[in-house]
Design a protein with these regions (language model features):
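Accessory terminal helices/loops
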Residues: 17-66, 278-283, 292-362
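Divalent metal-coordination and catalytic microenvironments
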Residues: 80, 105, 115, 130, ...
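Conserved beta-strand hairpin/beta-sheet module of binuclear metal-dependent hydrolase folds
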Residues: 78-129, 238, 244-249
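Active-site HxH/HxHxD metal-binding segment of metal-dependent hydrolases
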Residues: 131-213, 233
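N-terminal export signals
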Residues: 1-14, 42-45
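Metallo-beta-lactamase
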Residues: 110-112, 118-120, 213, 221, ...
Length: 362
């Protein structure tokens, strides 16, 4: 995207669906001159067309042209590992759509990014922080699932030369299918200007179904693992054995109440969490999808135990023949101080109830 100062002027023309008004004006003027059908007008038309093409090339190689946004400062989790902890609420214009975590891991051969960011401006701003930490190039990017705040910034990373992009296959296929719909929703909820420059680079991703191991130099590897669905139908978790470091994706929430979406299934979430916990050491350091870095015991309490306990209470209502009134009355006050509790407590309970009732009717 092209920004001057803090006022956005235009969006990067990275695809036919995202036309920079500045570039488009030269293309339109070129067409108007060409329509005059004289040798002079044709020469002038070619000049303007060439200029527009050159501007487009410069903007695309830059990925983003504009100010660095005041996103949260990356925190050092351990040596060579940094995470920007996103807002604990929804993505909004005020937080630039950044309500999940963005991480950078520095290896001998370069930097590995986990999550592309909700837009190119946030991705660029995170990149500037990385450049102040290390002069090593960003070489790899993995995204946690098929949500916009994981994927949309990927077009920035691709434009600046990151060619090793990774995602679980089902998530990548799904994001391609819902790209325009999701982009429109993000534009309405987080701002048109900050969203409009993103474009679909799912065809540039290397996909996997279960696991994929990546050699990142210095004898270290990164393991990409689809631990299973739950919050979303599938996901890309990441484990680095040499650092004993786990990226749980949205299977793990810390502080913030985890949320059940339209395509979420709580039983699958519980099962996937169990699988994840069984595949890593108990003393692993965890960077969750939402919330601050933590340990597995805390993550289990904040996510897994939350769902198991709520499930048990909802099951009691189902067994006694109760309905939504009883579901809404379930006491969840122990979680009342967690961010977005008021927005998610009842909807989560209702989601579990509806899921149980649907299974009961089979």
């Amino acid at each position: 995207a092209l920004f001057i100062g803090t006022a956005p002027l235009s969006a990067l023309a990275s695809s036919s669906q995202n036309t920079d008004p500045y570039i488009a004006s030269f293309k339109a003027y070129s067409d108007e001159i060409k329509a005059l059908d004289t040798s002079t007008s044709k020469a002038a038309s070619n000049t303007f067309q060439t200029y527009a093409d050159e501007v487009f090339s410069v903007e695309q190689k830059a990925g983003y042209i504009g100010d660095e946004l005041p996103i949260p400062k990356a925190v050092k989790v351990m040596e060579g590992v940094y995470t920007v902890v996103g807002s604990f609420i929804w993505g909004t214009p005020a937080n630039f759509g950044l309500n999940n975590n963005l991480s950078a891991i520095i290896f001998e051969d370069g930097v590995f990014i986990y999550n592309g960011g909700p837009n190119e401006a946030v991705a660029y701003s995170f990149h500037q922080q990385i450049k102040r930490i290390t002069n090593k190039p960003v070489k790899w990017l993995a995204v946690e699932n098929d949500q916009g705040h994981a994927y949309f910034g990927s077009s920035y990373w691709y434009d600046v030369g990151v060619k090793n992009l990774y995602s679980e296959k089902r998530a990548n296929d799904n994001f391609h299918q819902i790209f325009e719909e999701t982009k429109d929703r993000y534009a309405k909820g987080r701002g048109t200007t900050i969203t409009q420059s993103v474009y679909d680079v799912t065809d540039k991703f290397t996909t996997f179904s279960d696991t994929k191991t990546i050699d990142v130099g210095g004898g270290e590897t990164v393991q990409l693992i689809n631990f299973g669905g739950g919050h979303t139908p599938s996901m890309t978790g990441m484990y680095i054995p040499s650092r004993n470091l786990l990226f749980s994706g949205d299977l793990g929430f810390n502080e913030r109440v985890p949320g059940l979406l339209n395509d979420s299934f709580f039983k699958e979430w519980i099962s996937s969490f169990e699988k994840m916990a069984s595949m890593v050491p108990s003393d692993v350091t965890v960077i969750p999808g939402h919330g601050t870095p933590t340990d597995m015991a805390t993550l289990k309490r904040q996510t897994y135990d939350y769902f198991v306990e709520l499930y048990q209470e909802v099951q009691k209502v189902v067994d006694s023949g109760g309905g939504l009134a009883e579901i809404d009355a379930i006491d969840q006050s122990k979680h009342k101080d967690r961010p977005v509790f008021s927005q998610l407590s009842i909807s989560n309970a209702r989601h579990i109830y509806n899921e149980l009732m649907a299974q009961k009717s089979l």
